[in-house]
Amino acid sequence: MSVVFVTGNAGKLRETNHILAPTGIELTSHKLDLEETQGTIEEVSIAKAKAAAKILNKPVLVEDTALGFAALKGLPGVYIKWFLDSLGHEGLNKMLAGFEDKSATAWCTFAYCGGPDEDVLLFQGTCEGTIVPPRGENNFGWNAVFEPKGYTETFAEMSEETKNAISHRFKALEKLKVFLAEKAEQSK
């Protein structure tokens, strides 16, 4: 089974391929400049999947990530990319400087749309953790400042295997794998 993963983010593509590799699902990537709607992670993911399916006229997969700080009632949330671009890792830490609570939740939502006129299905995963001063190689996104609960390393300090076995993306992809395996079986 082949699915187009609509992303221009090499890190997301690499992680997703690594996690899906055992399934035999063929993932090809296609970069599209989709309108960034505002709303919840679910609303954003659905809008992106529908738009991509309409443009490409085939089954598509899009992914959206959010990082919410408990002290800020879930901010920056789906806007983490823009916060990170504007403030950097140090700025994310400064946002929490006046708060004792440094806990955060990472969300990953994969949205699958089988075609232009089909419903969008969502597959979500979360990972609880803490925002810490940047540590580890800044390999992508906010990995250097997110330390998952129960671990002493940030995502950036972890091996790819460790991170890909516990992350919010892994948890969402585990749900997606079940769906895609069933879909592949039905198409035989």
UniProtKB/Swiss-Prot annotation:
Positions binding ITP in this chain are: 7-12, 48, 64-65, 81, 140-143, 163, 168-169
Question: Oxidoreductase among the record's keywords?
Answer: no
State the SUPFAM superfamilies in the record: ITPase-like
Q: Which domain of life is it from?
A: Eukaryota
Q: What does this protein do?
A: Pyrophosphatase that hydrolyzes non-canonical purine nucleotides such as inosine triphosphate (ITP), deoxyinosine triphosphate (dITP) or xanthosine 5'-triphosphate (XTP) to their respective monophosphate derivatives. The enzyme does not distinguish between the deoxy- and ribose forms. Probably excludes non-canonical purines from RNA and DNA precursor pools, thus preventing their incorporation into RNA and DNA and avoiding chromosomal lesions.
NCBIfam families (UniProt xref): RdgB/HAM1 family non-canonical purine NTP pyrophosphatase
Q: Which GO terms describe its cellular component?
A: cytoplasm; nucleus
Q: How does it assemble?
A: Homodimer.
The UniProt record gives the binding positions of Mg(2+) as E36
Q: Which coarse location class describes where this protein primarily resides?
A: cytoplasm
Catalytic function, reaction form: ITP + H2O = IMP + diphosphate + H(+); dITP + H2O = dIMP + diphosphate + H(+); XTP + H2O = XMP + diphosphate + H(+)
Sequence similarity: Belongs to the HAM1 NTPase family.
Q: What is the lineage of its organism?
A: Eukaryota, Fungi, Dikarya, Ascomycota, Saccharomycotina
Protein name in UniProt = Inosine triphosphate pyrophosphatase
The enzyme's E.C. designation: 3.6.1.66
Record keywords, A-Z = Cytoplasm, Hydrolase, Magnesium, Manganese, Metal-binding, Nucleotide metabolism, Nucleotide-binding, Nucleus
**Cytoplasm found in the keyword field:** yes
Subcellular location(s): the record lists:
Cytoplasm; Nucleus
Any one GO molecular function term:
nucleotide binding
Which cofactor is recorded for it?
Answer: Mg(2+); Mn(2+)
Q: How is the cofactor bound?
A: Binds 1 divalent metal cation per subunit; can use either Mg(2+) or Mn(2+).
Broadest EC class?
Answer: hydrolase
> An example of a Gene Ontology BP annotation on this entry?
nucleotide metabolic process
